[in-house]
């Protein structure tokens, strides 16, 4: 269920001859901490898991998993993709037990094209490319200072209000779920206890791209999955036990603190209108 930015790295490692163990959700659509810990053995040197799934909002039990792994296998390097969780759900680098944490600016109102990698003290990593001495010699090339400054400003603005925004956006998620529950042709693909910032639903009988184009005409812009895999069928939903038919009609609704219940009302009204018009056409 990992993002392509991580998944493709491990695919390349596998092509180079490394053994890669991939963990899929169980029949209940869950990945437990036991699943993650049991995948590690004496030959493992790297574990990488996302904190929040970018298509469904599912939250993985990283803190408990990595805490146990570090006790059993202290030399294993742990990485966590926190792009969908940073400034949205509480993250404590001390208790997360991740040696490496990757975050990105474009998910938190910062400029696109800027991110950061947290490296725990004592963790040794190789240079990502050769050249100058920028970024402590890890990544050469002239830094995009406006982007970096914008990312820093976003952190300063949004970090103090993580809890308040989480509670508010949780109310929006609840409002949306209640609003669509009266329509048996809309299926909820996200779990109730996942991140409130992402809700994945399926409009039965209508392919994602058709509904998305209809919503665009109403100035409502959502997506059918990961923006990095536009036009490609999602394999993530299938991993969570969602059928091919529902996956083909899945759309992802993403919230932020500036959204309101009026936005949700407009979305649901448009879904109803689109459902009636598209199926009759």
Locations of regions flagged by a protein language model:
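Pyridoxal 5′-phosphate
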Residues: 1-281
């Amino acid at each position: 269920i990992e993002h392509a930015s991580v998944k493709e790295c491990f695919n390349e490692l596998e092509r180079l001859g490394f053994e890669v163990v991939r963990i899929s959700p169980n029949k209940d659509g869950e990945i437990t901490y036991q699943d993650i810990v049991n995948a590690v053995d004496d030959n493992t040197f790297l574990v990488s898991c996302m904190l929040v799934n970018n298509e469904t909002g599912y939250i993985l039990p990283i803190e408990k998993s990595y805490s146990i792994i570090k006790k059993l296998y202290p030399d294993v390097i742990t990485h966590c993709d926190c792009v969908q969780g940073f400034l949205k759900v509480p993250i404590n680098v001390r208790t997360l037990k991740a040696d490496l944490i990757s975050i990105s600016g474009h998910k938190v109102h910062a400029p696109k094209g800027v991110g950061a990698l947290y490296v725990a003290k004592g963790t040794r990593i190789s240079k990502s490319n050769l050249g100058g001495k920028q970024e402590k010699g890890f990544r050469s090339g002239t830094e995009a200072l406006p982007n970096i400054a914008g990312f820093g400003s976003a952190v300063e603005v949004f970090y103090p209000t993580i809890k308040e925004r989480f509670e508010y956006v949780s109310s929006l998620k609840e409002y949306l779920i209640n609003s669509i529950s009266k329509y048996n042709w809309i299926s909820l693909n996200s779990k109730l206890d996942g991140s409130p910032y992402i809700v994945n639903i399926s409009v039965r009988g209508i392919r994602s791209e058709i509904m998305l184009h209809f919503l665009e005409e109403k100035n409502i812009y959502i997506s059918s999955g990961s923006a990095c895999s536009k036009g490609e069928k999602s394999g993530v939903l299938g991993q969570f036990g969602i059928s091919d038919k529902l996956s083909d009609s899945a759309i992802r609704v993403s919230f932020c603190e500036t959204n309101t219940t009026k936005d949700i009302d407009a979305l649901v009204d448009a879904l109803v209108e689109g459902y009636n018009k598209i199926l009759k056409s």
